Every structure is written in C-alpha cells, then in structure tokens.
C-alpha cells in the first residue's frame, strides 16, 4: 500500500507527460471492461458494434446493445465524477437506473421485488445453486447498512481506503 501511495505522486507527472498515451489506454480499457462485464451477464454483440457503442458513435439496435450503452454511460459517469459519487444507496440506485435507461426496463433504479438465486447448469442440464442473494425485503436495509459501515470506517481513518473499497465491493 505504501508503494501505491508513493506512486500516486508520480502519477500526476506521468499523466501530464504522456496524456495522449493514457487517453488511448483508457479507451482500450473501457472497451475491454465493457466487453468482459457484459459477457459475464451473457450480453454480446460484434466487436465492431461494441467498439462503436463504447465510443458513442452509434445507437443501440438490440436489447443487448441497449444494456451495453447503459453500461458505457455509467462507466463514463464513474470515470468523470468518481470524486463526487458518495457510496450511498440513493447513488447506487441512480447508477442502476442509468444502467437500464436505454432498455426501458421498469426495474432500473429500484431494488429487486422478487427473491432470486444464481444457478449454474452442467453439461447434463443439472442445475445447482451457485449463490443465494438476500431476500428482496432485506435488500434496501442491507445496502443502507453497508454504505453506512463503509463511510464510518473511512471516517475513522484506521484502515486504508484501498483495503476498504474491495471489502465494500465484495460485500455488495
């Protein structure tokens, strides 16, 4: 962690000296992040369409592309405004709303209303429960509690935020 914090000072110099290179790397990272994150959810499009969607050079034609466009916009919001995005339930719901804004999905920006399980299916078609999320009725309080706990831990200053952030993500 100490090395990471030391390099943060050098990062500003590197950004200034190599701005064009970093801009290109950020664009590549956005495309790769969008592709990987959407593939996990079973959302696909062609590489050419993906690149154009991420660069906002075309409009989405399919439901998959609508979800990719929403992801692109949320990722852009996070990249451009991360210093101003508090870890609060209302902000998480706002980002969730924006994620689904192209698809017209009514659940965007709302907590789930039905219980669900994450299953996996083997080659023979047998399903097993991979993960069982909280029941729908517990979700709002759990998100509020997680956000409060994170902010309290950061406020105390006892732990480095670089350790708290992945803990928050894992618990989320």
Over which residues does each language-model region extend?
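FIC/Doc superfamily catalytic core
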Residues: 1-172
């Amino acid at each position: 962690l100490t090395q990471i914090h030391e390099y943060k000072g050098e990062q500003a110099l590197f950004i200034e000296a190599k701005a064009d290179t970093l801009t290109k790397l950020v664009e590549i990272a956005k495309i790769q992040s969008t592709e990987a994150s959407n593939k996990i959810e079973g959302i696909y499009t062609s590489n050419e369409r993906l690149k154009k969607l991420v660069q906002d050079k075309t409009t989405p034609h399919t439901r998959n592309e609508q979800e990719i466009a929403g992801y692109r916009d949320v990722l852009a919001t996070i990249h451009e405004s991360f210093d101003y995005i508090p870890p609060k339930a209302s902000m998480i719901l706002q980002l969730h709303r924006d994620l689904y804004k192209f698809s017209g999905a009514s659940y965007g920006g709302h907590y789930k209303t039905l219980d669900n399980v994450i299953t996996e299916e083997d080659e023979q078609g047998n399903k097993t429960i991979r993960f069982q999320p909280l029941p729908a009725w517990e979700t709002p309080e759990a998100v509020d509690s997680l956000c409060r706990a994170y902010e309290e831990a950061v406020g105390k200053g006892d732990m480095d935020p670089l350790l708290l952030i992945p803990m928050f993500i894992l618990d989320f």
